[in-house]
């Protein structure tokens, strides 16, 4: 998404990546990313909302075409991690195994000093990091 900052470019990239449309989307970003994915969703697709970082700065996140949720008969559901703490140990074990075996890969951006934390946080809100944003404390 970082190299596709405008809707046309993002639409083209998604069309290339998913020429047959999208059946499921795990959404953490919102904003233009969500708008672009909704335009590619297949009928009866599912959207799991787990974050909307594009709106964490307090600016409302507009949907460019909310009627797509109706016309495509999409199922959109929000998930809050803290509501599923009963399965946390099981999920942690399974995800840990996937990371350890290389089947699940992660990326992170590390700010080298605690003094860099404010700038790292602002960069997180502006999409300047890649993956999880961390700050080295020691």
Name each model feature, range by range:
Residues 1-36, 82:
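Adenosine-nucleotide cofactor-binding segment
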Residues 26, 38, 96, 118-122:
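Non-transmembrane alpha-helical segments in soluble domains
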Residues 11, 92, 114-118:
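Short, amphipathic alpha-helical "lid/cap" segments that border enzyme active or binding sites
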Residues 13-17, 98, 120-123:
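CheY-like receiver
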Residues 103-110, 118-138:
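C-terminal capping/lid region of NAD(P)-dependent oxidoreductase domains
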Residues 19, 42, 129:
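Short conserved AdoMet
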Residues 1-6, 109-116:
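Short acidic-hydrophobic, aromatic-tinged amphipathic segments that line or gate anion-handling sites
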Residues 32-104, 137-138:
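Glycine-rich phosphate-binding loop and adjacent beta-alpha segment
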């Amino acid at each position: 998404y970082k190299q596709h900052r405008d809707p046309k470019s993002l639409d083209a990239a998604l069309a290339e990546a998913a020429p047959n449309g999208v059946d499921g989307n795990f959404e953490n970003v919102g904003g233009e990313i969500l708008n672009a994915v909704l335009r590619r969703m297949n009928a009866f697709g599912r959207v799991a909302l787990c974050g909307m970082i594009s709106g964490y700065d307090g600016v409302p996140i507009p949907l460019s075409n909310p009627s797509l949720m109706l016309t495509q008969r999409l199922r959109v559901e929000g998930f809050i991690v803290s509501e599923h703490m009963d399965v946390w140990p099981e999920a942690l074990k399974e995800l840990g195994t996937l990371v350890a075996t290389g089947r699940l890969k992660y990326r992170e951006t590390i700010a080298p000093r605690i003094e860099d934390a404010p700038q790292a946080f602002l960069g997180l809100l502006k999409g300047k990091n890649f993956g999880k944003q961390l700050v080295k404390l020691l």
